[in-house]
Swiss-Prot record:
GO terms for cellular component: AP-5 adaptor complex; cytoplasm; late endosome; lysosome; nuclear speck; nucleus. It is found in: Cytoplasm; Nucleus. This is AP-5 complex subunit zeta-1. It comes from the Eukaryota. It comes from Mus musculus (Mouse). One of its GO terms (biological process) is autophagosome assembly. The keyword Nucleus applies. Probably part of the adaptor protein complex 5 (AP-5) a tetramer composed of AP5B1, AP5M1, AP5S1 and AP5Z1. Interacts with ZFYVE26 and SPG11. Keywords: Cytoplasm, DNA damage, DNA repair, Nucleus, Protein transport, Transport. As part of AP-5, a probable fifth adaptor protein complex it may be involved in endosomal transport.
Amino acid sequence: MFSAGAESLLHQAREIQDEELRRFCSRVTKLLQEAPGPATVDALQRLFLIVSATKYPRRLEKMCVDLLQTTLCLPASPEQLQVLCAAILREMSPFNDLALSCDHTPNTRQLSLVASVLLAQGDRKGEIRCVSQRIFKILENRQPEGPSVRPLLPILSKVIGLAPGILMEDQTNLLSKRLVDWLRYASIQQGLPYSGGFFSTPRTRQPGPITEVDGAVASDFFTVLSTGQHFTEDQWVNMQAFSMLRKWLLHSGPEDPCSPDADDKSELEGSTLSVLSAASTASRLLPPRERLREVAFEYCQRLLEQSNRRALRKGDSDLQKACLVEAVSVLDVLCRQDPSFLYRTLSCLKALHRRLGEDPGSERALVPLAQFFLNHGEAAAMDAEAVYGQLLRGLPSERFHSPTLAFEVIHFCTHNLALFDSHFLSLLRLSFPSLFKFLAWNSPPLTAEFVVLLPALVDAGTAVEMLHALLDLPCLTAALDLQLRSTQTPSERLLWDISLRVPSCLEAFQDPQFQGLFRHLLRTKASGSTERLTPLHQVLKPMASCARVTQCAEAVPVLLQAFFSAVTQTADGALINQLALLLLERSDSLYPVPQYEARVHGVLSSQLLVLCKLKPSLVVELSRELLEFVGSVSSIHSRASVFTCVVWAIGEYLSVTWDKRCTAEQINKFFEALEALLFEVTQSRPLADLPCCPPEVVTALMTTLTKLASRSQDLIPRVSLFLSKMRTLAQNPATSSVHSEEGAESIRTRASELLTLLKMPSVAQFVFTPPAGVCQPRYHRDTNVALPLALRTVSRLVEKEAGLLPG
């Protein structure tokens, strides 16, 4: 989120027109030809804002672009101007008028700026190879007074990411050697301050030793967690080298366990020889890549030891936690490339896991720790269930409000789906209530991740409980909000906190009467049971309009679609029946978030039809429940879309064609119930406090009644009479006060169409209950047997015999 002032500046930058931009470029061109000053800096800052504020590239005058390149390459140009020029040129890339070259740049700082612009071109003219060759030429210089490599390491990391295959074998070995030097042999004395001042004495300028985060004097080599007032150049390079270490190991390591660089150590995994090899004292004689792995392992072990110290400053404590995550990730890479590191790593990681449970704030390290045990747990013969349980259950319940943790945990699950065995998948499925807490609190950024994850979470044992949980997701968001606020003191809550204005929500959260429902809603694992949360829906109604709850509600329809797409792939008949009943039950039991009910009803109604298509016999098997559902007028007014689909499904699938158990008695029961309902919503006077019945429901009821009558032909005169009345009623001007003109016309048209078909009962039965062969493409491609042709022929015959039946 930007401040109002920043938003205003961005808006102005986006709205600037080409003519105004041309005039501004002329001013920038003039300033770049003069001596640099504050006006030049200000103009370049404004130009950078203009070119970076829009998604499409801005076109600048050629002279302006040429001067930007000239200023960037001039050794005498102030550093601030060079940085701004490089930033503007990067935003404009790629473009054809680039005249930069990294071959003649006088210093590494300027080379890093020029190289950043060249890499932004996208390797159109071999820029990446040119940049990498120039950097490696500098790396070959081992003179202490040589140019500083610190500005080049970010560029080198970018080169590795853009084109990892561009480096030659000798370049790979050279960089591995340099990384060994930078990581292992940085100075352990603090650097000198930039200026000691006129009155400083030699004693005050003498550098002191590097210290640990707890203030103790460092007794081992320098790392990124070493502290001091000032750092030397090689110490800064040490920090940057660690930041690119994992990327370089992944690039330079063996492509597979059988490659020569691995020395076939995968075959020795678990053997005494592997352990002896790992403990070898001749590591300095190893090839460059293996030597780098040894040094990287030592560096990470040192970081794990340093992270166990109690930091004196909060900034150092935060850095400890970040380095812990990276160190475990690097160790994972090392053990994958060389299994001889595995047994030296396990003991320290087991100790780390015990410590993570005691050290609040270090939970992020659980994700790489779980990844490590997932990759190596079987080889190490270690049961990592405690790590997985803490990651999938404890962490979401305690840290659901951390967006970073939420993304990392869910990304871990989606990224490793192919690696999960049946035991882990079972643990994952049982943990879905905890994972849903991340989703409920961070629904906009995590919705796409959960769409990928849901198929792995759904099985026959969790499907019903999970569907309840998805429908109650906005309610879970409100409950998590209250859980978080209940741990705060009144003075810690913000003035806009809704719980201050509606204290009943917090009181209900602490009320023993609702504790059981809240415990069920906030459970950490699947319980195998369901609870009706209607009392909570009413109690938490004041929070239904909260922004976070509304955002969560908007994600539910997408998640429901993903859920049904997954569950319908494997659901058996019993589960389909359960899901169909659940849809009917929950369609009138949703948390009252604005527009939530309508969106969810749209998904539920469409998915009910999918379930019926998968198992048409469910209409007969659930006839009692469906009769109860369609027997109430309230179902029409509260859930019209679901009701319409239920009525359609009855007309489509209540037939001997789909289920031999279907009887005439069942057809008559449904006919009488729907006939009475249609009479009630059309013939009786509508109540003032109830909306009128939608025309879509009326036409669906008429169609279903006609379908049922075509299957029990003694009902045809009865439905024909009713349809005649409906047609007359729709033509009555008084109907316009109940339905719109379009709605009344649709009712009249449908009644006329149905009456026409009923005049020839055998044809009506063929149309409304076609044999299975009609679904074959032949009926739609062959003009001699096409169904539309048959209907047109019947229509002409009926028109000639209009007096055959009353109507």
